[in-house]
Amino acid sequence: MEVYLASAAGLLSWCGKWRKIPTPLAHPTLLAACGADVALADSVNRLLYRQGRVSTLPPGVEVLRCWRNQLLTLSSETNCLTLYDAHDYPLVTSPAGIRPCDCAIVDCQVIVCGCEDGCLHIFSLPDLREIAAYPVPGCPMRVAADGGVLTCLSLLSPDPPQTLLFRLCLTSGDFAPVALLPGWCGAVTIADDHTIWAGVGEQLLHFPLDSVVPDVQLGEFGLIRFLSCQQSKLLISDPWAGRCLLMDTSPPYAPRQLYAGECGGCCFASCRKGTLPDWKASLNEP
């Protein structure tokens, strides 16, 4: 199992120990992996690096997603979703909400959190045609997909901050609130057993299937921004606290700190030797 982390130290890979992967981006903030394909972004300087190429991004990119051999970006400044081809040329752009800040892919659809317009927007791929928009309570800010069921975090109130965790069925549009939680929207992901892990405020919470009460509540986080679950492992990036952690999704739920420092996007990846020939791995510790 390999982990990628975008950090102030550059692009880092962890598989028992850290190695630094040199790239032209000195301070990457976002990344996306799909098999052996890794896309890396510096959203501050609007740069994208993928497959040996550097290209320019729109301002305000919040999210990178890989779809087949193509790339999706979501910008909270242009309020647009953009699909790029395999050579990082923009193919099509569609308006998507007001200050949109997250999206998820389900087969040939992409679901966008429209944030300030109060809707979840459903687009078809690859034409980015909007096929549905579901009004939801508050400002939807985070989304994870489990087949045709979406799990979302929506900010109901900023002062004091309150977040609604809910599920929505893509086929029927049925809406099911799960829990009202104190704190800002952080991140949400779905485990292999279809249960929910959510970062809200300073907490990490786990909700079993069909439960509105968390059976795990861990504190002492800053604000978790990225969560990824794979093979009973939970990867956590907490930029506010400046750390990346790995945890088993079974008791005793003890997060292990992998990295301390300024960090951004993280993900699990399976990268075969030789698939990134221009990324010469250094074994120096960050």
Which sequence ranges carry the predicted segments?
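Blade-level signature of beta-propeller repeat domains, shared across WD40, Kelch, NHL, RCC1
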Residues: 230, 237-286
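Conserved core beta-strand positions within WD40 beta-propeller blades
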Residues: 2, 37, 70-71, 109-111, ...
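A short beta-strand motif characteristic of beta-propeller blades
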Residues: 17-23, 52-57, 88-95, 129-135, ...
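Conserved beta-strand positions in repeat-built beta-propeller and related beta-rich domains
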Residues: 5-9, 40-45, 73-77, 112-117, ...
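An edge-strand/N-cap motif at the start of beta-rich repeat modules
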Residues: 1-25, 29-33, 286
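Structural motif
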Residues: 10-13, 46-49, 79-83, 118-122, ...
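Repeated scaffold domains used in trafficking and secretory/extracellular systems
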Residues: 26-35, 59-68, 98-106, 138-146, ...
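Inter-blade boundary loops/turns of WD-repeat beta-propellers
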Residues: 16, 43, 51-52, 76, ...
